[in-house]
């Protein structure tokens, strides 16, 4: 039985492990790339967004997936620029510039979709409704906090992920090169 609960400090190593295990090979195949992946997709969320982030825990207490969410992308970016982006620049100037543009690219949609999420599930737990349970917990939290929409970005070749997001109510809002931006409007209380 999978239990969904809020992310806690002791979950951060597991979340980082899952982030790297599920990342595409080309963004983790060197120590610098692996560090950039953690800084880009994990560490700012786990450092600043614990109240709107959740983990899935199996029956033995192992974290097998997570959903990380910033309820306000502009506030998140301010934190990201203040710490994680600076660390990325230390790994290489080109990597820093690319990361800056990747981080700000969803901002154009943040008026309609102020929240931004990142989700990863260990491969052996995919297809077992773990992602749907995490998504449900996040939607409930965002609705209770009166957040009007949430967005994400995924790769256009990640067909399985795009279908998962569509099944969970997301719609494609924009495509750019290899990226697909998806958004979900949430009911207001």
Regions found by a protein language model. Name each.
Residues 2-17:
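A short beta-loop-alpha structural element at the N-terminal edge
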Residues 17-32, 44-45:
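Helix-loop element at the rim of GNAT/NAT acetyltransferase active sites that forms part
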Residues 31-53, 59:
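Active-site rim helix/loop that mediates acceptor-substrate recognition in acyltransferases
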Residues 55, 62-71:
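Conserved beta-strand in the GNAT
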Residues 73-118:
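Conserved acyl-donor/pantetheine-binding loop and adjacent beta-alpha core of acyl/acetyltransferases
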Residues 112-115, 142-154:
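Conserved GNAT acetyl-CoA-binding A-motif
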Residues 118, 127-141, 163, 167:
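Conserved acetyl-CoA-binding loop-helix of GNAT-fold acetyltransferases
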Residues 148-162, 167-189:
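C-terminal "cap" of GNAT-fold acetyltransferases
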């Amino acid at each position: 039985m999978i239990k969904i609960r809020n992310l806690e400090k002791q979950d951060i190593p597991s979340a980082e492990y899952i982030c790297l295990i599920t990342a595409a090979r080309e963004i983790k195949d060197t120590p610098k790339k692996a560090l950039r992946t953690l800084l880009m997709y994990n560490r700012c969320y786990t450092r600043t967004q614990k109240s709107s982030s959740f983990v899935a825990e199996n029956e033995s207490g192992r974290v097998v997936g997570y959903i990380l969410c910033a309820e306000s992308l502009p506030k998140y970016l301010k934190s990201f620029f203040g710490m994680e982006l600076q660390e990325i620049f230390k790994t290489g100037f080109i990597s820093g510039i690319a990361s800056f543009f990747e981080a700000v690219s969803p901002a154009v949609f943040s008026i309609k979709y102020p929240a931004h999420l990142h989700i990863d599930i260990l491969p052996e737990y995919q297809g077992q409704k773990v992602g749907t349970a995490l998504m449900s917990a996040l939607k409930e939290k965002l609705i209770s906090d009166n957040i009007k929409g949430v967005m994400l970005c995924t790769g256009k070749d990640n067909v399985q992920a795009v279908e998962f997001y569509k099944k969970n109510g997301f719609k494609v809002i924009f495509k750019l090169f290899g990226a697909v931006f998806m958004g979900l409007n949430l009911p207001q209380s």
